Amino acid sequence: MASKKQRIGVLTSGGDAPGLNAVIRAVVKSASGLGWEVIGIHDGFEGLLGTKSYRVLTNADVQGLLPRGGTILRTTNKGHFGPRRSDELSEADPYVRAVKAIEEMGLRALITIGGEGTQRIALELHKLGAPVIGVPKTIDNDLAGTDRTFGFDTALQVATDAIDRLHTTAASHNRVMVLEVMGRHTGWIALHAGLAGGADVILIPEIPFSIERVAEKVMARDQQGSSFSIIVVAEGARPRGGSEMYIAEGRLGGIGHWVGEQLEKLTAKEVRVVVLGHLQRGGSPSPYDRLLSTRYGAAAVQAAARGIYGEMVALRGQDIVTVPLAEACGHLNRVRPHSDLVLCARSLGIAFGDEL
């Protein structure tokens, strides 16, 4: 009598990022090599609550996915899975319903691809007995427990390319160009892109800034014969003594335009503001992100084969390892104000708006 085919599930949750499809592809191809069946769950964790919200994924379904942005499974960062208010097990509890759905589908593992919010939900499901394995995703690179998340490198490439393009127009018109990039709570994109693109000022959430110091940097460049400036600001950056800025409830944004308006008043120079926004999320993943996503997907299946649950695959140095999901939850991977990268930037004359 033939044994029942092993089955695993995979879902994508939270904001989209380049490399999601590459992870899905690696999961399907690796599982297929073991003779396993893969169930793709639509619309993140919400798909565990619906009917007919999943489908079998075959090698044919993932053909050509490696360079494709977005996610064929769709995703959502809203829904029923908020923080659990009670340890009581109720049939109305979405977490309880999700665990039941996992059991009914006969999944030996559920691979959850996402950032801190996704892994927090996965951890709660694991506490209720679900065999979950996390895969770290966020363009902000702010997920704890791993040295690098996929999606970051592609976003960095987009931001750096934007700085390169802004340099030519800024120099041609003697303008100050302000580029607002993503980074709700951390400044990894702004810092890396600012260094790679040769910015003059970098403003990040970890280093509150004085707009007067930023203006002084712009005017100092003028006096030195450089009549244009490039300023890169993370969306979560904030002035010293101030708070983050929002363009709508729960949506960070507006800091770039605020910086631009203040600099026009303080320097009398012409300022233009560019907000990259979702351009950083879309499009084909970079070669590095394709490789990292592929390694993560394959490692997640290997973890399932070894019966390792309640863990997240992660990059440590050059190796892919597994770490407890709890390591990815509760705190963020932030830029250290005295890190080598920040010190490097300062040594090059890049200002952070906190100078004395």
Swiss-Prot record:
Residue positions annotated to bind substrate are T138, I139, D140, R175, M182, G183, R184, E235, R272, H278, L279, Q280, R281
Q: Which GO terms describe its molecular function?
A: 6-phosphofructokinase activity; AMP binding; ATP binding; diphosphate-fructose-6-phosphate 1-phosphotransferase activity; fructose-6-phosphate binding; identical protein binding; metal ion binding; monosaccharide binding
Q: Which cofactor does it need?
A: Mg(2+)
Q: Name one GO cellular component term.
A: 6-phosphofructokinase complex
Locate the site labelled Important for substrate specificity: G117
Q: Does this entry carry the keyword Magnesium? A: yes
UniProt keywords, alphabetically: ATP-binding, Cytoplasm, Glycolysis, Kinase, Magnesium, Metal-binding, Nucleotide-binding, Transferase
Q: Give the residues the record marks as binding Mg(2+).
A: E116
Q: Which InterPro entries match?
A: ATP_PFK, ATP_PFK_prok-type, Phosphofructokinase_CS, Phosphofructokinase_dom, Phosphofructokinase_III, PKF_sf
Q: What is its EC number?
A: 2.7.1.11
Q: Where in the cell is it found?
A: Cytoplasm
Q: Where is the active site?
A: D140
Q: Would I find Nucleotide-binding among this entry's keywords?
A: yes
Membrane-crossing segments per the record: none
Alphabetical list of Gene3D superfamilies matching this protein: 3.40.50.450, Phosphofructokinase domain
Q: Name one GO biological process term.
A: fructose 1,6-bisphosphate metabolic process
Q: Record-annotated residues binding ATP?
A: G15, K78, G79, G115, E116, G117, T118
The pathway entry for this protein reads as:
Carbohydrate degradation; glycolysis; D-glyceraldehyde 3-phosphate and glycerone phosphate from D-glucose: step 3/4
Q: Which PROSITE patterns would you find in this protein's record?
A: PHOSPHOFRUCTOKINASE
Pfam families in the cross-refs: PFK
Subunit composition and interactions: Homodimer or homotetramer.
What is the role of this chain?
Catalyzes the phosphorylation of D-fructose 6-phosphate to fructose 1,6-bisphosphate by ATP, the first committing step of glycolysis.
Q: Which family does it belong to?
A: Belongs to the phosphofructokinase type A (PFKA) family. Mixed-substrate PFK group III subfamily.
Full protein name: ATP-dependent 6-phosphofructokinase
